[in-house]
């Protein structure tokens, strides 16, 4: 799924560019999506496309990094 948050479903919205002379042309407002590694409840790690609001709210469970000696 491109350009859509995999947690909240946020996707592009439509609006207008408005010039100084008040001419309106269509445009799209894109969500701020980032790719992040997410640990599933089964323990698998998956790269997901999520919005920054979901990242900050803690909806994405980051995988634990194993340190090697």
UniProtKB/Swiss-Prot annotation:
One of the record's GO molecular function terms: structural constituent of ribosome
Any one GO biological process: translation
Protein name: Large ribosomal subunit protein bL28
GO cellular component, as recorded: ribonucleoprotein complex; ribosome
Family: Belongs to the bacterial ribosomal protein bL28 family.
Short name of one Pfam family: Ribosomal_L28
Membrane-spanning segments: none
Superkingdom of the source species: Bacteria
Xref: SUPFAM superfamilies: L28p-like
Alphabetized NCBIfam families for the sequence: L28
Source species of the chain: Oleidesulfovibrio alaskensis (strain ATCC BAA-1058 / DSM 17464 / G20)
Keyword Transport: no
Keywords in alphabetical order: Ribonucleoprotein, Ribosomal protein
InterPro entries reported for this sequence: Bacterial_rp_bL28 (IPR050096), Ribosomal_bL28 (IPR026569), Ribosomal_bL28/bL31-like_sf (IPR034704), Ribosomal_bL28_bact-type (IPR001383), Ribosomal_bL28_sf (IPR037147)
PANTHER family to which the protein is assigned, alphabetical: 50S RIBOSOMAL PROTEIN L28 (PTHR39080), LARGE RIBOSOMAL SUBUNIT PROTEIN BL28A (PTHR39080:SF1)
């Amino acid at each position: 799924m491109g350009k859509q948050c995999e947690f909240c479903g946020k996707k592009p919205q439509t609006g207008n560019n408005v010039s100084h002379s008040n001419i309106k042309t269509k445009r799209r407002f894109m969500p701020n999506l980032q790719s992040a590694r997410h640990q599933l409840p089964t323990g698998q790690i998956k790269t997901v496309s999520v919005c920054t609001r979901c990242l900050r709210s803690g909806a994405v469970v980051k995988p634990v990094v194993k340190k090697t000696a």
